[in-house]
Amino acid sequence: MNRVIYPGTFDPITKGHGDLVERAAKLFDHVIIAVAASPKKNPLFSLDKRVELAREVTRHLPNVEVLGFSSLLAQFAREQKANALLRGLRAVSDFEYEFQLANMNRQLAPEVESLFLTPSEKYSYISSTLVREIAALGGNIEQFVHPAVADALRERFRA
């Protein structure tokens, strides 16, 4: 069974992330969205809320599972018996960091391959950071995120 992990902070999960998950679900038997705790990034949403939102966005995909994690990614991949890590590349600027990360993960878990997908053109400019900034300033985020995520962002910035 081909099991792929798609790791990230997903703060929040965007339509760009969803696009990659949909495509991965067609390529792999089982897709695990691994939501990283990432305390150093000081996420807007709690780990539990980010997991909940990712589950809502992907509930129509039977071979997709969403799990939170706070360990080393290579260790988590082994625990989940994954044979691949999936990363998205939006632009050339993402490549250098992702290349270093892939090489480090190869050293830590040589049995787990790193694979890259580029987003559909209509999502290539979307980032969680930009979505948070637009939401914080009261802008329209509906075109960038699932309705449940838009609701969560509006509620968060109302508080």
Swiss-Prot record:
It catalyses: (R)-4'-phosphopantetheine + ATP + H(+) = 3'-dephospho-CoA + diphosphate. Its EC number is 2.7.7.3. Keywords: ATP-binding, Coenzyme A biosynthesis, Cytoplasm, Magnesium, Nucleotide-binding, Nucleotidyltransferase, Transferase. GO terms for cellular component: cytoplasm. The record marks H17 as: Transition state stabilizer. Gene3D superfamilies: HUPs. Its main location: cytoplasm. Pathway: Cofactor biosynthesis; coenzyme A biosynthesis; CoA from (R)-pantothenate: step 4/5. It is an enzyme of class 2 (transferase). One of its GO terms (molecular function) is pantetheine-phosphate adenylyltransferase activity. GO terms for biological process: coenzyme A biosynthetic process. Substrate binds at T9, K41, L73, R87. ATP binds at T9, F10, H17, G88, L89, R90, E98, Y123, S124, Y125, I126, S127, S128, T129. CDD domains: PPAT (cd02163). Its cofactor is Mg(2+). It holds the Pfam family CTP_transf_like. Homohexamer. Belongs to the bacterial CoaD family. Reversibly transfers an adenylyl group from ATP to 4'-phosphopantetheine, yielding dephospho-CoA (dPCoA) and pyrophosphate. This is Phosphopantetheine adenylyltransferase.
